[in-house]
Curated annotation (Swiss-Prot):
Its EC number is 2.1.1.216. This is tRNA (guanine(26)-N(2))-dimethyltransferase. Keywords: Methyltransferase, RNA-binding, S-adenosyl-L-methionine, Transferase, tRNA processing, tRNA-binding. GO terms for biological process: tRNA N2-guanine methylation. S-adenosyl-L-methionine binds at R36, R61, D78, D120, A121. InterPro entries: SAM-dependent_MTases_sf (IPR029063), Trm1 (IPR002905), TRM1_arc_bac (IPR022923), tRNA_met_Trm1_C (IPR042296). HAMAP family: tRNA_dimethyltr_TRM1.
Length: 377
């Protein structure tokens, strides 16, 4: 395996040389640097001590956790023997001290404890029952096959950080797969990315509720080809019930107008969901991440700006894409800033959204958004 060295944050990492990232014997995606940046900032803000990077590949995420956060014990796991050997090499590259290797486990004891394992992620998480403060799942595709085990491995007041890259499934391109994996009806069109993210969270909430665990969404977002969510678990049946009450369904008609309802069973056959209708962020948490991003070494130049957009985004479910609304009603497309300004003048709140550069989140009714577009003609 031919290797090259890359730098990200404070880490130096050996990665395979390959023309296409998917052809490499061990997976490494430089485009996920922003994802890893936000994860490092989140772990730094939380101060979690015991961390599991369950699907570690090159080890870049777990090594950045060890170098850049207060975490004291970091486990890096991958079932691929090539990945295990590469993680060991990368740990040696970034940390002094003797790495003790025995079979499919390597341990480095020092100021930080690093544990590298070559194991099936589900088996490892089931064996380490309620051991970790922070469990990170960053799979290729859907995280659902790992979720039950992750909920066993994390402490009952711990944090799950979960990535899903099966956006085609969650966004309705593969409806049957969404029904199978997430037990939810997806939606196509301009709302698919936010609905897909909320379907993912809604499924996680239902899984957690089986173990009498409630969920607080610290931050959830869509970016490029993936969804990402940081979920703080809350212990107790009542907190699980409270989280379940924030599930519901989305409806959208041909005009582009949408509505949603908090209910266990939908009132109409045209429902999309069940999905999460609660907040996608804890405002104080996101503000802290944005503050930390100004002083922390980052792997992506886009991280701080993206966190600023998330920080300023209005916390309401779903949005109106001005291009889609204009197209449906035979109107000319106008600048988003103009629509936002008109809504503000009428006393409504309105902001840009990270889900689309041509969309806005607002507490204004659909008719007011449509009227604002007409005023700009």
């Amino acid at each position: 395996m031919e290797l090259k060295e890359v730098r990200e944050g404070l880490a130096r990492i050996l990665v395979p040389k390959a023309e296409r990232i998917y052809d490499a014997p061990v997976f490494y995606n430089p485009l996920m640097a922003l994802n890893r940046d936000i994860s490092v900032l989140a772990l730094k803000a939380l101060g979690s001590r015991r961390v599991l990077d369950a699907l570690s590949a090159t080890g870049i995420r777990g090594i950045r956790y060890a170098l850049e956060t207060p975490a004291g014990e970091i486990w890096l796991n991958d079932i691929n023997p090539n990945a295990f050997r590469l993680i060991v090499d990368n740990v040696k590259l970034n940390f002094s001290g003797e790495l003790e290797i025995e079979g499919k486990m390597a341990v480095l004891e020092g100021e930080k404890t690093l544990v590298v394992t070559n194991a099936d992620a589900n088996r490892l998480m089931n064996e380490q029952f309620r051991y970790f403060d922070f469990v990170d799942l960053d799979p290729f595709g859907s995280p659902m096959e790992f979720l039950d085990s992750a909920l066993r491995a994390v402490k009952r007041r711990g944090v799950l950080a979960i990535t899903a890259t099966d956006t085609g499934v969650l966004c309705g391109a593969y409806r049957n797969a969404c029904l199978r994996k997430y037990l939810a009806e997806p939606i196509r069109g301009e709302l698919c990315h936010e609905a897909g993210l909320r379907i993912l969270i809604g499924t996680l909430v239902r899984y957690a509720a089986k173990y009498d665990l409630g969920v607080e969404v610290l931050l959830a977002y869509y970016r490029d080809h993936y969804f990402r969510a940081f979920l703080q678990l809350r212990n107790g049946a009542k907190t699980a019930d409270k989280s379940m009450k924030q599930l519901g369904y989305l409806y959208q008609d041909e005009s582009g107008k949408f509505e949603f309802e908090n209910t266990f069973l939908p009132s109409k056959a045209t429902a999309h969901g069940p999905l999460w209708l609660g907040p996608l962020k804890n405002q104080e948490f996101v503000e802290e991440l944005h503050r930390l991003s100004a002083e922390h070494p980052l792997g992506s130049k886009k991280t701080q700006k993206f966190l600023g957009l998330l920080k300023d985004e209005l916390e309401v479910p779903f949005f109106y894409d001005t291009h889609a609304v204009a197209r449906r009603h035979g109107l000319e497309v106008r600048k988003l800033a103009g629509v936002i300004e008109i809504l503000y003048e009428k006393g409504y709140k309105a902001t840009r959204t990270h889900f689309s550069p041509t969309a806005l989140k607002t507490d204004a009714p659909f008719e007011e958004v449509l009227e604002a577009l007409r005023e700009l003609q």
